Amino acid sequence: MSHPNKKRLRRSMMFLNCQKPGLIKDPYIYRPDSIMLDLEDAVAENQKDAARYSLYHALQEIDYRGVERVVRINGLDTPHWKEDIRVCVAGGADTIRIAKTETAQDVHTVEEHVLAAEREFGRPEGSTLLMAALESCKGVLNALEVCKSSDRLIGIALSGGDYTKDLQTVITGTGVELQGARQQMIIAARAAGVQCWDTVFTNLDAMDVFEEEVKMIKMMGFDGKSLVNPRQIDVVHKIFTPTQKEIIFAEKVVKEIDEIGRASCRERV
C-alpha cells in the first residue's frame, strides 16, 4: 500500500465545524498546515447527515491549496462512524481522525472499514491516512500499542477536555493536569516513529499563556498543536519553525556526516 505524505509538516491543525459551510469554504487563507473538519462534538446530533453532505461537497469542490484535509469522525460507540468513513473516503479526505481511541483494535476496526470504502469508491488502497485521538486514561496508557497499530497511522493527538474529565479533575489553566499524558504520549510516539499533537487551548483572551504553552510542548518534543482559532496559527508556526541558527547547525551536521561517509568509502576502495 502507498501512504502519501505520512511525514508531512503538521504544526497546526485547525478545527472547523462541518455543520457550518461558511467556515469550511476558505480556511486555507489562514495558511494552517492541516484543517480538522469536524463531524463529532461540534455537530448537533440531528445535524449529522447535513454535516456529512457539506463535508462531501467541500472535499469534492473546494481547492484547499495544499492544506491537509483531516476529518474527525464520530466515536465507535455511536451509530454515525461507519457512514462518516464512507463519506470521507468517497470525498477524498487525506486523513481520518479517530475519536476516543483506546486500543489498537479501535484503529484496526476503522482501518477495515476505510479499506472497504476505498475499494467501494475506487480510491487507491492505503491512500486514506489515520490519526488517533486519545481522550481517556485507558487510551493514554495504551498509547504505544495504538501508535504501532497500523501503517496508515500518522500519529496520536491528546484531547485534553475529555481526558481531564476521565482523570476526575479539572482544567487548571496551568497544564499540570495534562503533563503525565503529554509525556507518556510523546514517548510512545517517538518509540513508534509517528507524530504527536497537543490538545487545544480555548482561552483566546490569554494569547500570552497560549504562546508559553506552545513553547513548552515544542520543548517536550511535540510535532504541533490542535487549534480552535486562526489567530493561533502564526504563533504556532513561529515557534515550531527552525531559527536560522538551527538551520545552519543542521546543515553543518549533515555536511559532516556526508564527509565522513565519503571518507569511509575511500578507505574501503
Please report, for each region that a protein language model flagged, where it lies by residue:
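Expand to "…catalyze enediolate/carbanion chemistry for C-C bond making/breaking, isomerization
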Residues: 1-268
